[in-house]
Structures are given as C-alpha cells and as structure tokens.
C-alpha cells in the first residue's frame, strides 16, 4: 500500500466511512488496526467481495440522501475526488460531506494532478484555459466486448481543491 494511504489510515479516527471502497483493502487494514469502519460502494459485486472478506459494507451511493449516518472520518482514497464527477458538482459534494460528518470530523482524500499530461518538452505546461478544467475526464469500462456506460470522473490539483474547500467551509 502506498505510503500516503498508510498515513491516511493511521490518521483516520472514530467512526470511519470508506467511500468508493472497491474490494475493501483500506477497510481491511482499518479492521486490523482495530478501527471502526463502514465501507460503501455503488457496485453490488464490490460489496459482495467485501462482505465475503469480512468487511462491514453496504451498497450505497455516497450522494443518496437516505444515507444519513454520521462519521468522524470520511476516507476517500485512490483518487477519491473522482466521485465528484466534474467541477459543476463540487458544491453538492461538499454539502454531502457536511451531512455525513460528525461535529469536528475530517475528510482524508487524495487525487492526482493531471497537469503532467500537458507538459511540453521544455518543461512548460500547455493547458487551454478556455476549455473545461483539465482534470475532468470521461471514463468507460470495458471487459472483452462488454462496454459500460460512460461516467464523469474528477482529478483535482491541490490548489483547485483548496480553493473549493475554502469556498465551502473546509480547509485543505
């Protein structure tokens, strides 16, 4: 597990929500540390795998208003900002965080800055500022001939994250 993720798991405290947990690797590590966590994912197969591994897990969309539990730590690792989708959704994302965080709670998430994809040979960065934010991408999963639907995914650079966090009452 990458060092950054190990640090996040060590810092996670209280009741922990592991968002977009996938196979549950972070929740498994939290369990081994004796920490109280709940893993959520929208994929029924991911939830099935987690349950088979002994991870407390539920099939839940993070944005589902019916999911009303409170957590001391919200964990969003492995490019956790992706579920924001695009910058148009960022206010909704922070509102949702406010609704699931217990008083004094924290969010531990990571993201990749895709700026390196726009680096020129001389080291300069060539980004079209008139275009949409460079970290917004469209994904489509494929297995053999089976194509999934496309979906939005957001990679945030730290400065953009810090700006929107402050605009929404958080600190990065």
Ranges and model annotations:
Residues 1-15:
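Conserved alpha-helix/loop element of class I SAM-dependent methyltransferases that forms part
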Residues 23:
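Conserved SAM/SAH-binding loop
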């Amino acid at each position: 597990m990458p060092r950054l993720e190990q640090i996040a798991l060590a810092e996670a405290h209280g009741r922990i929500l592991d968002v977009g947990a996938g196979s549950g690797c972070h929740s498994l590590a939290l369990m081994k540390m004796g920490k109280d966590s709940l893993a959520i994912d929208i994929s029924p197969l991911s939830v099935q795998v987690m349950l088979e591994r002994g991870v407390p897990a539920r099939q839940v969309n993070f944005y589902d208003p019916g999911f009303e539990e409170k957590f001391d730590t919200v964990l969003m690792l492995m490019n956790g900002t992706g579920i924001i989708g695009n910058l148009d959704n960022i206010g909704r994302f922070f509102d949702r965080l406010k609704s699931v965080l217990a008083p004094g709670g924290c969010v531990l998430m990571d993201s990749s800055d895709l700026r390196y994809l726009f680096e020129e040979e001389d080291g300069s960065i060539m980004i079209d500022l008139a275009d949409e934010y460079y970290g917004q991408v469209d994904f489509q999963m494929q297995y053999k001939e089976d194509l999934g639907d496309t979906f939005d995914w957001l990679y945030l650079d730290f400065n953009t994250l810090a700006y929107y966090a402050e605009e929404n009452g958080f600190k990065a």
